[in-house]
Amino acid sequence: MQNDAGEFVDLYVPRKCSASNRIIAAKDHASIQMNVAEVDRTTGRFNGQFKTYGICGAIRRMGESDDSILRLAKADGIVSKNF
């Protein structure tokens, strides 16, 4: 919900799983949030930006988290397409 100034005033904004688009519940203690740094291609140094991926506990329980993170990183251009 937003107020008249356009600021978010909700007390709780749920996260969503980046792989399955499910809402990550507050009691899902198996879920993770991972920041992957963006690196300058010429110097190999961190440029101050990162991509955030959230993986829910159900994906981790099935053992699909590594494949999901790799698929998301390929789609964002962090990992090369032929990796």
Swiss-Prot record:
Keyword Ubl conjugation: no
GO cellular component, one term: synapse
InterPro entries xrefs: Ribosomal_eS21 (IPR001931), Ribosomal_eS21_CS (IPR018279), Ribosomal_eS21_sf (IPR038579)
N-acetylmethionine: residues carrying this PTM: M1
MF term (GO), any: structural constituent of ribosome
Subcellular location as annotated: Cytoplasm, Cytosol; Cytoplasm; Rough endoplasmic reticulum
GO biological process, one term: cytoplasmic translation
Chief location category: cytoplasm
Modified residues (N6-acetyllysine): K81
Domain of life: Eukaryota
Keywords annotated in UniProt: Acetylation, Cytoplasm, Endoplasmic reticulum, Ribonucleoprotein, Ribosomal protein
Gene3D superfamilies in alphabetical order: 3.30.1230.20
Family membership noted in the UniProt record: Belongs to the eukaryotic ribosomal protein eS21 family.
Subunit details: Component of the 40S small ribosomal subunit.
Biological function: Component of the small ribosomal subunit. The ribosome is a large ribonucleoprotein complex responsible for the synthesis of proteins in the cell.
UniProt-recorded name of the protein: Small ribosomal subunit protein eS21
Species whose genome carries this gene: Mus musculus (Mouse)
Source organism phylogeny: Eukaryota, Metazoa, Chordata, Craniata, Vertebrata
